């Protein structure tokens, strides 16, 4: 009799344990499938730009987009400037080698990431420029400086794109919502002159609020001289025969058009 009761108790205990295990499993599955926890640490743009610390982090991210394939000077094998002279490089380098560039044995895939990083930086800079004025922890001088730095960076990213890809799309400064239709986000290429004029005007505007020099802690940030120097270089390149066809050479870029047949390079010599 007692043995029968013992079996009953065991079955009851086993049933309770089974129910608890199933309940815990359902609960854990519910927690696993819940995505709310992934959004708890996401900040709104308003919260970010009301905070001095978060705003500085946002600006730092803009500068971060100058790294990797956007570096002007870097270690051997990772920048085209490394192959601009007759210095000897180790051919066992795992990246693109000296001879690959010397003999033209490369394609567009090597610099594709630069295109992505530039437009990422352009978007980051535009968002900062459009929102930083709500910050109450920064002084007016700091806000003007941060906006000017972002403006410099945005223009510089376009300069990098122009040098590598020629005429590129100029993205609206109010930025593009990811919720828009794909076709609404597909902006056509702007002409070479349009991109140059944008860079020139934005660099001149940035120079008005940038300081002439910075302290040691901020020595790598943009300055008035940097903005004016980039602007001068852009205009110098634009005035060269490569981009400004001389009389008698007007058909040089006659077939350089977009899908709508719009000319992307000027066909008229500009003395200015």
Q: Over which residues does each language-model region extend?
A:
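Conserved, well-structured interaction surfaces
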Residues: 51-70, 74, 91-165, 183-219
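Short coil/turn linking the two alpha-helices of tandem helical-hairpin repeats
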Residues: 162-163, 169, 237-246
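Bacterial Sec-dependent N-terminal signal peptides
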Residues: 23-50, 199, 232, 247
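Single conserved hydrophobic/aromatic residue that forms the stacking wall/gate
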Residues: 1-9
